A protein has these predicted regions:
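Cytochrome P450
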Residues: 1-406
Length: 406
């Protein structure tokens, strides 16, 4: 690879189908590499663990593009209100706004609330596996990995039963649209507006008639007299749904594929199900559902990792590459469900660490053991080379995972 080849093409087949050899070659050459095929003009991609970890904590970089003299596509004046609301979320905020939003949301989205979902989540897992067991061949993505987190977050948010099928269809369609770039997203405006109206109506209803659910808790969250605005609540709901949903879907889907491709690790987990927490951390590292972080924008002309970076330049923290960095992990290309320590970056680091991490870990720790115990003889129904991958936004996941359960 000469200097002319030092770039990462988001639209290349290699990046979609198996990016890890490409990451390894880039890591060996440079900590920052230009990106092609992204809506972010002039974007760079951090390839190494140290570079990504420093990027996510360096105060010289902003999450809000406006603080670096740049702009964010989702917040453009011509964007529909839906996307402006979605883009103006906690993830794209800096201090003090980020701290204000996180403090308020953390009063509603608590570890206790997540733990209280365990029994309901177990029931949903068993119901979905019962349905899968009736089939001779099953697509794990559409039958289990996709509906599970949607069903759990629906229960957690208190979405009425009568609205759940419509909500599930709308969310699945919206998340799938990110694979089609900006055109795919814009085609989802009518669907997105329907979801927006559903959420706004639900927020209004919970404001008038609070219940024991996440929406009611967000409405009631207060700190020193401060409350979330209506737009803050809608953007937070979308953030929880989109970010949390895709992470869990692909932890389950790609994680199951990784186990099937490493039968000795699968057998070890079946023999020692109590090791599931450690296993989930390794599956997060090894599969890295999120390819990269939200962009960080240089607040000024600066030097980072030996590279000159001009003000306003967006840098993507390449967590999928960082999680396979030879300088951060021993034998990083090996799946080791007993790996400790395991300081992966799959859920971020620093003040923007994923708030939904406890829920993603709970869902994964219930779904994967139940799946492998229920179907001890499950196997791929097609050769692994025939599996197709999707790239909705910064996520890499399977289009389908055809399995023979027995």
């Amino acid at each position: 690879m000469d200097s002319a080849d030092l770039f990462l093409d988001f639209k290349s087949p290699a990046f979609r189908n198996d990016p890890y050899p490409l990451y390894a070659r880039l890591r060996a050459r440079t900590a920052l590499v230009p990106v092609r095929g992204s809506y972010l003009r002039g974007a760079l991609f951090a390839t190494r663990y140290q570079a990504v970890a420093e990027l996510l904590k360096d105060p010289r970089f902003a999450n809000d593009a406006h603080h670096a003299g740049a702009s964010h596509a989702m917040g453009a004046w011509w964007m529909p209100r839906l996307f402006q609301t979605m883009g103006n979320n906690m993830l794209n905020s800096d201090e003090p706004r980020h701290k204000r939003l996180r403090n308020l949301v953390s009063r509603a989205f608590t570890p206790v609330r997540v733990r209280e979902m365990r029994r309901a989540a177990e029931v949903i897992v068993e119901r979905l596996l019962d349905d899968a067991a009736r089939r001779g061949e099953v697509d794990l993505m559409s039958a289990f990995a996709l509906p599970l987190p949607l069903a759990i977050i629906s229960e957690m948010m208190g979405i009425p039963e009568a609205d759940r099928a419509r909500f599930h269809r709308g969310m699945t369609s919206l998340t799938n649209s990110f694979s089609g770039g900006i055109v795919g997203v814009l085609m989802q405006i009518p669907n997105g507006n329907r979801l927006l109206r559903l959420f706004e109506a639900l927020i209004d209803k919970r404001r008038a008639e609070p219940r024991d659910d996440l929406i009611s808790a967000l409405v009631q969250a207060e700190e020193d007299g401060d409350r979330l605005s209506a737009d803050d609540m809608v953007s937070m709901v979308f953030l929880l749904l989109l970010a949390g949903h895709e992470t869990t879907v692909n932890l389950i889907g790609t994680g199951t594929l990784a186990l099937l491709q490493h039968p000795e690790q699968l057998a070890a987990l079946r023999a020692r199900p109590e090791g599931i927490q450690c296993a989930i951390e390794e599956l997060l590292r090894f599969t890295s559902p999120a390819i990269f972080t939200a962009p960080r924008y240089a607040r000024e002309d600066l030097e980072f990792q030996g590279h000159k970076v001009t003000r306003g330049t967006p840098i993507l923290g390449g967590v999928a590459s960082a999680n396979r960095d030879e300088k951060a992990f021993t034998d990083p290309e090996r799946l080791d469900l007993a790996r400790e320590p395991n300081k992966h970056l799959a859920l971020g680091i620093g003040i923007h660490f994923c708030m939904g991490a406890p829920l993603a870990r709970l869902e994964g720790s219930l779904a994967i053991p139940a799946l492998i115990q229920r179907f001890p003889a499950m196997r791929l129904a097609v050769p692994a080379e025939q599996l197709q991958w999707r790239l909705p936004g910064n996520i890499r996941g399977l289009v389908a995972l055809p399995l023979r359960p027995t």
